[in-house]
Each structure stands twice: as C-alpha cells, then as structure tokens.
C-alpha cells in the first residue's frame, strides 16, 4: 500500500480528516500552475510538464508565502510586486517541467524533450544546455548546488532565441566566488 501524503504549505498543527467512502481528505496541498494542478513528487516538490509560451503570464496558486520564494529570472519575471503569484514567461515557447521546491522555496524550470525526458542540445542548436558539475554553482543558492547529472540538480539554461541560451549567476550566492577567474 502507498502512504497518503497529507501535507500543508504552512507550518503548524492541523486536524487531518479522511472520508473512507469518498477518499477525500485534508489538508492536501493543491497547487495550480495556470489552471492545471501540479503533481506531488515528494514532500518537498510538486511539478507539472506543460507547454509554456513566451510572453504569456502564468499564475501559481496554493503557496501562501510565494511572494518570498525565489523565481529564476532567466525564465520568469514578476511584473507586479503586489501580485507575486503572476509570472511572465521569458524564453522561447516550448515544453518545460515546472517544479515548486518547498525546501529551497524556489520555482525551478527544465526544458523537456517529452513528458518524461529532459531535453538535450540538438545538432541544429535547439533543445537545452545544462550547467552541471559539482558544488560550485546552484540556484537559487549554493545550498541547491548542481551535480554531474541534469536529473539531479543540473541547471537548465533559458533558450532566449535560436541558438542563444542564458544563465544568470551571482558570485557568492549562486556561484562560489573563490572558484572562478576572469
């Protein structure tokens, strides 16, 4: 049998209810990206694979403190600080995985080849480029450092135009300041 994932995005004590006839229970977190419910991956992560359109606004609902979360500015812009849940998508239109990471309070975006496979760089320059390799770079901070595998913490670069990708890092925050030279 599988465990029932009772969870809430706010800390505190909660009364858990479960109806054995209808299998309805609470407190289940219900996160919506746009109009679509995100799927619980584990206790810290919810995700959805969907087509994102350049210039379109999307709303994330269900995270009470989302205004305090980091959003990858290579992928999204918060156009109105009074409405932090509304995000404008910046890169090229395509299939992406959007992950709400509660541990790091971060919205992570990954380019996808299919609903289950991460995109890779194609011969024509389309697809995705990944920053991987150790504990010296991470988003939103070094606490979420990349690994040697895109699936385990690699950073997807935003495809901003044909054959043009973008990754923004901040020395001392998302990049170990003693690990690079110019």
Where are these regions (language model features)?
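Insoluble glucan recognition modules
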Residues: 1-182
């Amino acid at each position: 049998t599988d465990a029932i994932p009772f969870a809430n995005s706010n800390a505190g004590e909660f009364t858990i209810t479960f109806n054995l006839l209808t299998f309805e229970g609470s407190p289940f977190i219900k996160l919506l990206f746009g109009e679509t419910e995100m799927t619980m991956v584990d206790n810290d992560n919810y995700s959805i694979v969907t087509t994102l359109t350049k210039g379109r606004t999307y709303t994330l609902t269900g995270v009470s403190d989302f205004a305090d979360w980091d959003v990858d500015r290579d992928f999204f812009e918060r156009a109105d600080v009074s409405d932090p849940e509304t995000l404008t998508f910046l890169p090229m239109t395509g299939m992406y995985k959007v992950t709400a990471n509660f541990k790091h309070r971060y919205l992570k975006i990954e380019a996808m080849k299919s609903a289950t496979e991460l995109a890779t760089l194609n011969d024509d320059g389309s697809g995705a480029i990944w920053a991987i390799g150790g504990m010296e770079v991470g988003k939103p901070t070094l606490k979420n450092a990349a690994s040697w595998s895109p699936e385990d913490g690699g950073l997807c670069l935003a495809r901003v135009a044909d054959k043009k990708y973008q990754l923004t890092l901040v020395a001392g925050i998302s990049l170990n300041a003693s690990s690079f030279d110019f």
